């Protein structure tokens, strides 16, 4: 490998023996031989890889030459079949391109009132954003209001005022019962009962006025007897 002769090896051995001595010389020889073996193995692996790469390159070149020769030497039937396959592939490509262009560019342009729908849920429901805006802009129907109280008041104008007066304490007692605690519910009920009893019982007759002559006679004897009582 290094083209070293026997005389050169002996010269190196003597120099190493003088420099290193008899104790270090065997260790140095072992290390040098290990390095030489590693270098040889590395060189052999690199050489093998280079040869493999060269062989692969030669095979590729030979395959290219064979393909070119086979193309030139094809029969007319094979050439016609290859051309038909190419035309079919081109037509399929054009068809798919047309479908994609139609899907991306519809006849109606995408404007503010008709934007492009990309949400799958909106596409599934079939509602476009423009239709949703139109439905949102539609006027809301006002709910019908039933005026039942005025109709009842017009239908029954001649109800007695006493019924309203009796109903007011009852309503007040119901409101007090709903808002106040249970301990204060009995007071409005008792007051309503007292009002009902007072309204049911007749009023007592007023005392008749006394005549002036009778009042004088009644007071006269008392005044006459008063001096006698004092004398006694």
Curated annotation (Swiss-Prot):
Similarity field: Belongs to the TatB family.
Name the record gives this protein: Sec-independent protein translocase protein TatB
Role played: Part of the twin-arginine translocation (Tat) system that transports large folded proteins containing a characteristic twin-arginine motif in their signal peptide across membranes. Together with TatC, TatB is part of a receptor directly interacting with Tat signal peptides. TatB may form an oligomeric binding site that transiently accommodates folded Tat precursor proteins before their translocation.
Localization per Swiss-Prot or TrEMBL: Cell inner membrane
NCBIfam families in the record: tatB (TIGR01410)
InterPro entries in alphabetical order: TatB (IPR018448)
Compositional bias (Low complexity): 189-203, 214-232
Keywords, ordered alphabetically: Cell inner membrane, Cell membrane, Membrane, Protein transport, Translocation, Transmembrane, Transmembrane helix, Transport
Membrane topology: Single-pass membrane protein
Record GO biological process: protein transport by the Tat complex
